[in-house]
Amino acid sequence: MSVRITDIWRAFQGLVPSIIATADGRGMPNVTYVSQVYLVDERHVALSCQFFNKTRRNLDDNPVACAEVVDPLTLQAYRLRLKFLRSEKSGPLFDTMSLRIDAIASQTGMTGIFRLIAADVFEVVSAEMVQGFLTDPPPDVRSGISLDGARTEMRGLQLVSERINRANDLESLLACVLQALEEFFAFSHTSVLLWDEQNRRVTTMASRGYGESGVGAEVALGDGVIGTVARERRLIRLTSLEADLRYGRAIRRESAAGERALEAEIPLPGLKDAQSMLAIPLTVGDRLVGVIAAEDRDPMRFSEWHEAYLEIIANQIALGIDRMIERGDEAADAGVPADTVPLPATSAAGSRMIEACRSKRRLTYYRNDDAIFVDDEYLIRNIPARILWKVLGEQQRTGRTEFSNREMRVDSSLGLPPVKDNFESRLILLRHRLQQKCPDLQIVSTGRGRFALRADAAIELVER
């Protein structure tokens, strides 16, 4: 029975390995597995040309092939009769296929080795269901999204948009977005990472489903799936994630036997057993703001429909973040002047008595590493570390506990970039890290463009 290849889109997600059969000019067949047959449009598919030298030589001699793809939900097989048209080494199709492979390569330490050589494009001469392959599929398996489901998700989109618009600050904006994605769309493992231009990294500012440990995690530009999305500023959707990583690691082991040095593998952020992932860049114009990522243990959790849907949400999030950055700049300018120093709340003698009754925490700043450790455990580094060290030192010298964003911005010792900088995001990161590692020490917002240092322990400062 003939089928339209766009109706069997699940079979092209790469969850079940596909089979490709070719023959050389003398008719000698060659059959091999391929990780994925890429659905181009209703009449064309593409194969990634990476290591299949025999397949490629056969196509040059005899430009016909037969592929078998399998629906991962029904396990129904479909046979495609193909005619080889061309091999593309650049262009939109090549870039799209290459992006996925590059992300997997980076995730497994195979950058530059595990890569796309070309995208081989085929015309689909015919597509048919393999008769007798299975019994009838389960009746509850659906090929698409119902109208009611689409209406529900459109209502969810409206509610997410409302929450973004109502957010009063960056921290509440990020938290409410991730909460809404779980409430309305059951995306239970999500994170938002913001771009740090100075350090060329994206930093996790909010997460849901991972616990507190995810906040503060950094990903360098081009590292792993998230780093690749940030570098290319293009969406990546991965299904059968574990199979892709396993394949990349297998190639890595073969390459490691040679003389070529390989970089260390980067642990996949989030779920260790994630089977699907969707990562979308947050951009305003051509400027990178960050990345939003979602993961799931269901290998078919995200579809092309989710890509389009989350891109709409990502655009709104990016604009919302940009609005908060602008508001933060205004708040910094409106903050108290740098020479305004509130008096300590207690006398020096009273402070010493309070200190004697409190627990003690030792914070060590390692200047060469630009990092702070609390009781020999890593706390934070870079600009947030310098901010914390600045206010801690000021508090110990003068007893001062309240500060303004403006004075931090104009303090050259902190090394803030001269261009527009999301200072508020650095305070959010610092606040979360203190909550995780040193709850006796808090950074508290005290008004627009102002914050305070609150200490419930005696603080010892050590600089090395």
Task: Label each PLM-derived region with a short phrase.
Residues 377-411, 430:
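Short amphipathic alpha-helical recognition elements used for nucleic-acid or partner binding
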Residues 205, 212-270:
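Regulatory sensory and allosteric helical modules in signal-transduction proteins
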Residues 213, 272-275, 289, 295-312, ...:
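Regulatory loop-to-helix N-cap segments in sensory/regulatory domains
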